[in-house]
């Protein structure tokens, strides 16, 4: 079949590809053979997982004892242990009792869904330009990844906290509630991050050290107004219907560079996490927020908490949308290293000190080198014409 002019555009959005009616995905979206064994339609895999009573389930943890002043110490202790175990064994959990109103989460989802329902040409008014250093805005993962292939997703990406640093001119003007709902969700997620970091700190060092992790993430080597708070970045992932989900991924397997990542979604399955040697499909747990442990927290915990390897699958039936808030330390002014109390003769430091930006740069460089080596291997040792710039972000 002759390609349409749309499919020949170098920067065609994945949504436009999906709406074009193509029956086979372009070759640049086909994953390598060694990745495809576990891929498939996300709905089919979710149904299979739901019917498999031996399949492990991502833990669901209620943290309401830390938001309820009338809770008992035993309840808080049990909560600390449940969060600690989930972060250590899984690196991911569903958080219930988080205190963010269901009405606000519904508003956030409605606003993001309305933005992506706009025609592609309208969304292009918010297009980013990673090549020019403008990462915030509407985009597609057009840069190649570890294997050199593209991912089946479009996205909207921007800073949400601190609010004073956010450029609201880059945020969608439509729908009208987008800015208000997103700002409110950002404020509340910042509070949730503090609560969860306190619980995770207690799981490492005891109930009198609940401030350890947040201090480590915000204690700076310089003192400017922008340097003493966590940064929260929002990425709305839009995974269009895919005619060949057994060949593609929405997001390839990766760990997040953040300290924590908070995830909402529209109820369509797609998230998988690696537990042991098995890919586990996340179930829909209404009212909860999914939380990932990221690289920064794994470093601070000296590996006691696990940065979870995960990926996003696609399907033929429905669009999947997810809202991910990445909670990160300031990029240049905080030195990440294992907490001193967790480094002993029997448990030496597993990570060398680095800033968040240095960690991100190392990770991008490693991915670029992996892609280059693979390209050269496939090209008989001369892979110069396969070189690509790394993606604007690894999450």
Curated annotation (Swiss-Prot):
Keywords, comma-separated and alphabetical: Dioxygenase, Flavonoid biosynthesis, Iron, Metal-binding, Oxidoreductase, Vitamin C
Catalysis: reaction(s): a (2R,3S,4S)-leucoanthocyanidin + 2-oxoglutarate + O2 = a 4-H-anthocyanidin with a 3-hydroxy group + succinate + CO2 + 2 H2O
Domain of life: Eukaryota
GO MF term list: 2-oxoglutarate-dependent dioxygenase activity; L-ascorbic acid binding; leucocyanidin oxygenase activity; metal ion binding
Cofactor notes: Binds 1 Fe cation per subunit. Binds 1 ascorbate molecule per subunit.
Gene3D superfamilies documented for this protein: B-lactam Antibiotic, Isopenicillin N Synthase, Chain
Family matches, as Pfam families: 2OG-FeII_Oxy (PF03171), DIOX_N (PF14226)
Known pathway: Pigment biosynthesis; anthocyanin biosynthesis
Stretches the record annotates as Disordered: 360-395
Presence of the UniProt keyword Iron in the record: yes
Annotated binding of Fe cation, by residue: 254, 256, 310
Listed cofactors: Fe cation; L-ascorbate
E.C. number: 1.14.20.4
Domain Fe2OG dioxygenase: 230-329
GO BP term (any one): anthocyanin-containing compound biosynthetic process
Enzyme class of the recorded protein, top EC level: oxidoreductase
Family: Belongs to the iron/ascorbate-dependent oxidoreductase family.
Purpose: Oxidation of leucoanthocyanidins into anthocyanidins.
Protein name: Leucoanthocyanidin dioxygenase
Organismal lineage: Eukaryota, Viridiplantae, Streptophyta, Embryophyta, Tracheophyta
The encoding gene: A2
